[in-house]
Each structure stands twice: as C-alpha cells, then as structure tokens.
C-alpha cells in the first residue's frame, strides 16, 4: 500500500470566515495557521498547498492576556543603520489592527515559497464588512 500524496490540481480550497472578537491572539493564530497549511485535512501533503482560505473579521477586537497590551513589543527595521523602530500592542492595534494577527500567523508558517503563497490566503479586516461574499465563506467556530 502506498502513501497518497496530494497533487496541486486535485486539491480543493474552501473559504471560511472567523470572527476574532474577544478571541485570544495566540490561540486564534495557531488554529488559523494550521488551517491555512491544510493540516486539518487527511490529504495534507507538506510540499503541496492543501490549505483553505480564511477571512477574519473584527481583527481590531482581538484580545491578549496579562499585561501584554503594554509590554508586547513589535519591531521593524528600515534597512538603514540605526533604523530600528519599536511599537507596542496598543499602538499597533490602534493604527494597523490587521497587522497584529498577520505577524502572529506569519511567524507560525514555513519560510519559503510555499509559506509565502500560504499567507496570501489569509484575508484580514478590522470591521465586520468584507468583500468576499461571492465566495460564500462558511462560518468557522474557533
């Protein structure tokens, strides 16, 4: 008996919608990362993109535990000497609410061409409105 390996042509990608309101950042991010990779499917193959599309709404209402709202730091670098910038969770959620969940999920995905293609299947929105009604996403309770 041979191990079945999924072919890219025979993989189906479903659309799911997740409401992030009141959900804990890390716990939600791990579930999303696993679904984006396709690890929940029996046909999971590490070198083939078998994951689903995930639409996240209310990304601005995501929660963190403890004092992480003030203490959690996010860094970025301009590429120039001395060009490192630092911000905390509260400031980042106020200016770019989608960026918080994007950084959390992106860090959990593999680096390389497959990981870069996988992160493109994550659609993040701060409010309840999203332009993906035509795909008829199914409600996913995480």
UniProtKB/Swiss-Prot annotation:
CDD domains: Ribosomal_L13. It holds the Pfam family Ribosomal_L13. One of its GO terms (molecular function) is structural constituent of ribosome. Keywords: Ribonucleoprotein, Ribosomal protein. GO terms for cellular component: cytosolic large ribosomal subunit. Belongs to the universal ribosomal protein uL13 family. HAMAP family: Ribosomal_uL13. Part of the 50S ribosomal subunit. This is Large ribosomal subunit protein uL13. The lineage of its organism: Bacteria, Pseudomonadati, Pseudomonadota, Gammaproteobacteria, Moraxellales.
């Amino acid at each position: 008996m041979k191990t079945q390996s999924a072919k890219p042509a025979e993989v189906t990608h479903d659309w799911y919608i997740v409401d992030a309101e009141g959900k804990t950042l890390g716990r939600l991010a791990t579930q999303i990362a696993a679904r984006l990779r396709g690890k929940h499917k029996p046909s999971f193959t590490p070198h083939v993109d078998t994951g689903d599309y995930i639409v996240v709404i209310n990304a601005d209402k995501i929660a963190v535990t403890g004092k992480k709202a003030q203490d959690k730091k996010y860094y970025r670098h301009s590429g120039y000497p001395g060009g490192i910038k630092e911000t905390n969770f509260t400031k980042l959620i106020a200016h770019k609410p989608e960026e918080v969940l994007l950084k959390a999920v992106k860090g959990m995905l593999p680096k390389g061409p497959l990981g870069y293609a996988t992160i493109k299947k994550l659609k993040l929105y701060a409010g309840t409105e999203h332009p993906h009604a035509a795909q008829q996403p199914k409600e996913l309770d995480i």
